[in-house]
């Protein structure tokens, strides 16, 4: 914890006041990523709802950003899981699922997304993404799955 406090530029006591141990600190880091993903999904829907963007474009953009977050959080999630850290997924997952569901519904209605696409499909794709991939791997992965997401009008 001392090394982490030095790197963060805070006193060790300050770090311990907020996070009693490394497991709690890692859980907080992973929670931040999960919350950020949910916020991003909601922001994407809000842009579509306000008429500032297209649902298919926002969904693909969200996936790209989500993959970047998956890459950045990969090590923290692995260590947190190994230490048995308690990560709160329920509330942010509900927010993300609702926002992504609205994006998909709008995209299907416009014909830009395939008519049978579901939020579960997106989650399956994200789970099987190789989280330690380079930017080139992420770009190629998105390029390969894009045709499977888009409808005939996409």
Label the model's feature ranges:
Residues 4, 29-33, 37, 100:
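Generic hydrophobic, amphipathic alpha-helix propensity
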Residues 75-82, 112-117, 153-154:
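Short, hydrophobic secondary-structure boundary micro-motifs
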Residues 57, 91-93, 109-124, 135-136:
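All-alpha amphipathic helical-bundle segments outside canonical DNA-binding/catalytic cores
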Residues 98, 102-112, 125-154:
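C-terminal peripheral helix-coil segments that are non-catalytic and often amphipathic
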Residues 1-24, 28:
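Helix-turn-helix
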Residues 28, 39-71:
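Hydrophobic alpha-helical connector segments
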Residues 24, 61-102, 127-131:
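Short secondary-structure transition hinges
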Residues 3, 24, 57-65, 121-124, ...:
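Amphipathic alpha-helical interaction segments
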């Amino acid at each position: 914890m001392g090394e982490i406090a030095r790197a963060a530029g805070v006193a060790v006591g300050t770090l311990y006041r907020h996070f009693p141990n490394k497991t709690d600190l890692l859980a907080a880091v992973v929670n931040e990523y999960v919350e950020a993903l949910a916020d991003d999904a909601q922001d994407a829907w809000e842009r579509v709802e306000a008429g500032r963007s297209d649902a298919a474009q926002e969904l693909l953009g969200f996936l790209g950003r989500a993959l970047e977050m998956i890459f950045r959080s990969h090590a923290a999630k692995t260590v947190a899981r190994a230490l048995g850290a308690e990560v709160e997924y329920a509330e942010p997952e509900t927010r993300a699922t609702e926002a992504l569901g609205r994006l998909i519904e709008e995209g299907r209605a416009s014909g830009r997304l395939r008519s049978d696409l579901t939020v579960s499909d997106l989650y399956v794709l994200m789970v099987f993404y190789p989280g330690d991939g380079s930017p080139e791997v992420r770009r190629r992965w998105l390029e390969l799955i894009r045709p499977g997401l888009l409808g005939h009008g996409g």
